[in-house]
Amino acid sequence: MKLKTLQLENYRNYEEVTLECHPDVNILIGENAQGKTNLLESIYTLALAKSHRTSNDKELIRFNSEYAKIEGVLNYRHGTMPLTMFITKKGKQVKVNHLEQSRLTQYVGHLNVVLFAPEDLNIVKGSPQIRRRFIDMELGQISAVYLNDLAQYQRILKQKNNYLKQLQLGQKQDTTMLEVLNQQFAQYALNVTLRREHFIKELESLAKPIHAGITNERETLSLTYLPSIKLSDMSKGEQTLWDEVITLLNDNIKREMDRGVCLFGPHRDDLGFNVNDMDAQTYGSQGQQRTTALSIKLAEIELMNIEVGEYPILLLDDVLSELDDSRQTHLLSTIQHKVQTFVTTTSVDGIDHEIMNNAKLYRINQGEIIK
């Protein structure tokens, strides 16, 4: 899939702008705080109906404006598709082919993106929350079922935590409601856990050879899914696994009541990275951690192509300067002529000349595009 045009109205520091996109590489160059990252963010937001930089949609609306609008025309294997996102201070509206989508789960997945920003280098050494968000953002784009299960899980988790807090404070005495919530919680927790486990296995199978290529076969990468709910054997039947989950929850009702919070579930999952059988988070060098992060991002691109039948759009936010020549070369070999890419940078110095030869350059200055 390729983004043909991108139009912004009152988005961040852009009053009104139209970008005619190059099918291969689009380089956005400018000083800091001019709007380069805002442009990339708008593409990400158009894809996932949420920003990766803020959870408050109001921040996306230009100062002193009533609304923000993002519109993109997508070229894909079946033809052309317009996508629209309209944001007001009361909420947001999304459209596919000019038809409003009542649920975000119906919208997400039409435009697939992979974002690689400097903070993504923290996927290895950062907090478990960063890794859970990474799983959710990528898996959610290729599986509407996962997105729905996750939304239902988060809804019930919130209800359960509220009820546990009331029990802890003595505002409630009856645990019957908690047992009912656990029944629903167990099903969605199991669904999310199984889909995450399958996703990590697929991602690992693609990341391993990529990582080996970058390191000239000197290093071996492995991924380990670390679920909060530890099941004896995930290949068992769903009913058997559900029984295990509900038993765990029921056995720990008193602990959770004492703590006033849910102690088990996918909201406490983590993902481990091992390089040559050593924990990359604890023992990996900065170079090893960056190679691991790049391998994961390149594997994402391939996995989306396998699952969706088309390559996603790649967003590189000021990250090329963080990669040495070898890593840039492997990045180039993955994206060349098949993945539409948007790159932000303050200077073209250090960008591979092959990337430059196949690119369209846009200069960004105070929310305006100077071609």
UniProtKB/Swiss-Prot annotation:
Q: Name one Pfam family in it.
A: SMC_N
Q: State whether keyword DNA repair applies.
A: yes
Name any Gene Ontology BP term: SOS response
Q: Which domain of life is it from?
A: Bacteria
Report residues binding ATP. Answer: 30-37
Gene Ontology MF term list? ATP binding; single-stranded DNA binding
Per the record, the major location class is cytoplasm
GO-annotated cellular components:
cytoplasm
Q: Where in the cell is it found?
A: Cytoplasm
Matching InterPro entries: DNA-binding_RecF (IPR001238), DNA-binding_RecF_CS (IPR018078), P-loop_NTPase (IPR027417), RecF/RecN/SMC_N (IPR003395), RecF_2 (IPR042174)
PANTHER family documented for this protein: DNA REPLICATION AND REPAIR PROTEIN RECF
Q: What does this protein do?
A: The RecF protein is involved in DNA metabolism; it is required for DNA replication and normal SOS inducibility. RecF binds preferentially to single-stranded, linear DNA. It also seems to bind ATP.
Please identify the protein, giving its name as recorded.
DNA replication and repair protein RecF
Q: Whose protein is this, by species?
A: Staphylococcus haemolyticus (strain JCSC1435)
Q: Which gene is the coding source of this polypeptide chain?
A: recF
